[in-house]
């Protein structure tokens, strides 16, 4: 998906694969060729294979809440003590999890690591962006309250939904391309046609 693809690109750019031995799992492409990041080759492993997952020290998942809700509790109940790093929202409110946004809460992350926390999750994208811009104001007690309203973007649904959105945008553009190419055409007429 989109989140995983962006993560992989960033890890390549920052040479993170130089320091780890990655094993790649999939919920839908078991047995296909795995990415060759970090100089490793092989096939995609079964993301539902608890025994294989239990052998790992760290699991990074961008699979989504359904996967997390199914696999995470089973792993923890089996005694797995590894680090779970997750982009899904499922674990955000758990007492044994920390939402990670290191420019804002590095001290909380460090304290958690020092105190045995092993579950780290990404925050809501809109809230994370807001905190990146307002974090210093919060840290200096300069904000009484914030009211935020958002609309979940298509990107939150993953690559398939982004592709669908772009296809729909293309159809809309095709429907009004002539009018858009004419500077004198009225935008409200174009909007009504769409």
Go through each PLM region and give its residues.
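N-terminal Rossmann-like NAD(P) cofactor-binding subdomain of oxidoreductases
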Residues: 1-194
């Amino acid at each position: 998906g989109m989140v995983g693809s962006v993560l992989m690109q960033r890890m390549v750019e920052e040479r993170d694969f130089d320091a780890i031995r990655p094993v790649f799992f999939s919920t839908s492409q078991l047995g296909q060729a795995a990415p060759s990041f970090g100089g490793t080759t092989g096939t995609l492993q079964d993301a539902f294979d608890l025994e294989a997952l239990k052998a790992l020290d760290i699991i990074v998942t961008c699979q989504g809440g359904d996967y997390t809700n199914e696999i995470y509790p089973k792993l923890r109940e089996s005694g797995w003590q590894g680090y779970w790093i997750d982009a899904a929202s499922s674990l955000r409110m758990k007492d044994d999890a920390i939402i990670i946004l290191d420019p804002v809460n590095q001290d909380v992350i460090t304290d958690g690591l020092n105190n045995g926390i092993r579950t780290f999750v990404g925050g809501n994208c809109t809230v994370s962006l807001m905190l990146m811009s307002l974090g210093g104001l919060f840290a200096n007690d300069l904000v009484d309250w914030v009211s935020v309203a958002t609309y979940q973007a298509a990107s939150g649904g993953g690559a398939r939904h982004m592709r669908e959105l772009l296809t729909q945008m293309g159809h809309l553009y095709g429907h009004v391309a002539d009018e858009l190419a004419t500077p004198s055409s009225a935008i409200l007429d174009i909007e009504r046609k769409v």
